[in-house]
């Protein structure tokens, strides 16, 4: 890996992982209400109306699990870096808005997108996450100083004024049926006022980038990525069965070349499957989650079961309690490494969310030549 001082290189989700960022739970807050967030929190959630720092015992437990995961990866020969947490329990503001708290830095996958030798900071679509990129700047600065070919890019910071959000999304009176109608017609909380995207809405398949259009990424954001990565082909996808479409990695998960697992409640629409089917890829339903409900004070759904981290085309990390997902991947010929992380889910997600690639072996390939 030290050859030519190359530090940053990652073209897909499955080539052998050699260097990764793992998040931290320090100081994580439940953010105060804001337009983007209200639409994401289900009406019956215990998160509604609650904000401020998470309790010390839950932070300590989450950090213990993240530290253990980091140690496991290091024992596998993978270099692990960690972000520098900010004091998230403080108000932040721009000339357009004020947020009572920030969020945290447990899920680097939301903020950082690695494509080849470039790490791109996403715009983010929550006000409470506007400054989150600062947690990763010490690492990115270090990579930039040591790797002469590394590109450190940042998408234009959005203003996130009220014009970015649909007010009618915020009502408690809107039920799931209506929300499903809205998501099927691609009517989301975010408007097309300016480009918005979270990095966790983007999957890398070599020359092709597959991007979820949903709550946290709009069409202008997808267009910005298309213009930015002009040598790539960009495909917008959506999953009509998800009333809260945010981040693609608990819905559509590539395991290795030719194989994707798809959330059976949020299937990729038929016309969007064509790209995969025409090129010999198999899309199969993911196994059912082992849990009926998410952990307390957690934004994510039970489908974090499929939020796995692929270490190489034969090895995958799966949350320890997710026995059905582990069994399925085992039957598909993968070596499954169980990793305890459920008590950290509430801090920002699962094994894929809490990591961001720095270096995977491999080169840029075309996995979808027939288009």
Where do the language-model regions lie?
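The feature marks the mature, well-folded catalytic cores of soluble enzymes
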Residues: 1-371
């Amino acid at each position: 890996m030290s050859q030519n001082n190359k530090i940053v290189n990652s073209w897909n989700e499955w080539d052998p992982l050699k260097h990764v960022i793992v998040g931290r739970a320090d100081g994580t807050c439940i953010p105060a209400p804001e337009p983007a967030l209200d639409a994401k929190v289900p009406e019956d959630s215990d998160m509604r109306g609650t904000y401020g720092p998470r309790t010390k015992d839950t932070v300590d437990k989450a950090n213990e699990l993240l530290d253990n995961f980091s140690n496991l990866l290091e024992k596998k020969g993978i270099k692990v870096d960690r972000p520098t947490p900010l004091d998230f329990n403080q108000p932040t503001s721009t000339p357009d808005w004020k947020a009572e708290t920030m969020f945290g830095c447990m899920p680097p996958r939301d903020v950082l997108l690695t494509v080849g030798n470039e790490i791109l900071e996403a715009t983010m679509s929550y006000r409470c996450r506007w400054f989150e990129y600062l947690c990763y700047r010490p690492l990115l600065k270090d990579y930039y100083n040591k790797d002469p070919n590394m590109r450190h890019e940042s998408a234009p910071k959005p203003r996130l004024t009220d014009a970015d959000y649909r007010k009618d999304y915020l009502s408690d009176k809107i039920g799931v049926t209506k929300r499903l109608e809205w998501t099927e017609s691609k009517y989301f909380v975010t408007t097309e006022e300016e480009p918005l995207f979270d990095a966790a809405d983007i999957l890398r398949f070599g020359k092709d980038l597959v991007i979820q259009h949903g709550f946290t990424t709009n069409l202008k954001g997808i267009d910005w990525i298309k213009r930015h990565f002009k040598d790539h082909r960009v495909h917008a996808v959506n999953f009509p069965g998800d009333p809260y479409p945010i981040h693609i990695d608990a819905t559509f998960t590539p395991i290795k070349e030719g194989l994707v697992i798809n959330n059976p409640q949020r299937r990729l629409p038929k016309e969007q499957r064509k790209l995969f089917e025409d090129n010999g890829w198999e899309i199969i339903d993911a196994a059912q989650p082992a849990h009926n409900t998410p952990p307390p004070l957690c934004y994510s759904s039970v489908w974090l079961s499929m939020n796995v981290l692929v270490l190489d085309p034969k090895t995958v990390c799966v949350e320890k309690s997710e026995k059905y997902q582990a069994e399925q991947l085992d039957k598909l010929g993968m070596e499954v490494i169980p990793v305890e992380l459920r008590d950290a889910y509430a801090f920002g997600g699962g094994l894929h969310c809490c990591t961001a690639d720095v270096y995977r072996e491999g080169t840029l390939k075309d996995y979808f030549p027939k288009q």
